[in-house]
């Protein structure tokens, strides 16, 4: 997507609340924006670096709990609580990543170990009743405070305000991740995804860049988790569940993991679909599983990747180059 098209898309989305007076549709967009951030952050680890992390849902859910606990226990604002949660995820991700990457875990083994850490986090949340309220969850009544042009400092309450806040956050995440992917760091990610052993022989510090990808992705997931919980006003252990991890993987594979925009498309579809056909929680898992199977079999590049491939039949959506070519032209 060119810069001009991106600007037009953002302007149209900014005008949408003025054109549509449906709170239901705006609510779907808010969820899609927040889950779009989550999908992009996962794709940074999975799509661009080739690491199938099953800890992502845990980072998403833990951040919601930490933000709320910081606000209530330390009497700080939402934004300070979010910084504390992001910092906690940075440290926790660095520890988990160091353990995994020092032992050179990858593919199936990396997925299993990160899943084990995620399940440990879920069990802590589920059983630490004094802090998390266990399986009952926490009702969130606090609101983020934000300065609005012409209106001063206001609590972010109501769907229209959350719409603009989540849209701005999504645009920032897209811009930051696009910059990362196009940078020298992004080329190192690509080289590691293609062949991490060859990347190491070319002088890339594989441990360092895998750890960077894992940590950055989880910190962005932490932001998405806090936004999600404070928008719906409730936090529960299911945020850290395997079902949530499956949903994240489905978003990325459906939209396409070879781009930044692809996961956002997947998030929009999987946000709207369950509400459009009135699916309950159990049927959603079945749908996510079917989507994973059909996408892998019929559209391995995802919706966005398949569209770009058909639009430019002689050029892949993201050129698949040897690891050595991925490192040309160091800035």
Segments (PLM) and residue ranges:
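Cytosolic-side transmembrane-helix boundaries in multi-pass membrane proteins
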Residues: 1-14, 139, 194-196, 201-208, ...
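Hydrophobic alpha-helical transmembrane segments
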Residues: 3-8, 28-29, 33, 58, ...
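Single transmembrane alpha-helix segments in multi-pass membrane proteins
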Residues: 17, 22-74, 99-109, 189-191, ...
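Transmembrane alpha-helical segments in multi-pass inner-membrane proteins
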Residues: 57, 210-298
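Alpha-helical transmembrane segments within multi-pass membrane transporters and channels
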Residues: 74-117, 265-267
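Helix-loop-helix "hairpin" substructures at the membrane interface of multi-pass membrane proteins
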Residues: 157-236, 330-331
């Amino acid at each position: 997507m060119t810069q001009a098209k991106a600007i037009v898309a953002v302007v149209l989305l900014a005008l949408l609340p003025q054109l549509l007076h449906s709170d239901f549709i705006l609510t779907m967009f808010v969820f899609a924006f927040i889950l779009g951030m989550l999908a992009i952050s996962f794709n940074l680890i999975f799509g661009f670096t080739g690491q199938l992390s099953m800890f992502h849902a845990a980072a998403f859910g833990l951040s919601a709990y930490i933000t709320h606990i910081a606000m209530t226990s330390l009497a700080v604002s939402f934004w300070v609580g979010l910084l504390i949660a992001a910092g906690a995820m940075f440290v926790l991700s660095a520890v988990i990543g160091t353990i995994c990457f020092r032992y050179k875990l990858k593919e199936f083994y990396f997925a299993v170990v990160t899943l084990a850490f995620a399940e440990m986090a879920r069990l802590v949340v589920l059983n630490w009743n004094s802090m998390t309220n266990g399986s009952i969850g926490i009702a969130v009544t606090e609101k983020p405070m934000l300065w609005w042009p012409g209106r001063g400092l206001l609590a972010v309450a109501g769907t229209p305000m959350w719409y603009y806040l989540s849209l701005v956050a999504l645009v920032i995440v897209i811009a930051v991740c696009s910059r990362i992917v196009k940078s020298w760091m992004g080329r190192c990610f690509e080289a590691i995804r293609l062949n991490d052993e060859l990347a190491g022989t070319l002088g890339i510090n594989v441990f360092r860049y895998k750890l960077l990808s894992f940590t950055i992705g989880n910190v962005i997931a932490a932001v998405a988790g806090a936004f999600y919980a404070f928008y719906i006003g409730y936090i529960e252990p299911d945020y850290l569940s395997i079902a949530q991890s499956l949903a994240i993987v489905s978003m990325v594979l459906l939209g396409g993991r070879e781009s930044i925009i692809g996961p956002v498309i997947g998030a929009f579809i999987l946000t709207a679909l369950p509400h459009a056909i009135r699916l309950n929680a159990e049927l959603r898992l079945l749908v996510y599983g079917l989507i994973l199977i059909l996408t892998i079999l019929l559209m391995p590049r995802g919706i966005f990747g398949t569209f770009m491939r058909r639009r430019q039949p002689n050029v892949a959506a993201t050129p698949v180059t040897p690891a050595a070519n991925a490192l040309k032209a160091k800035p």
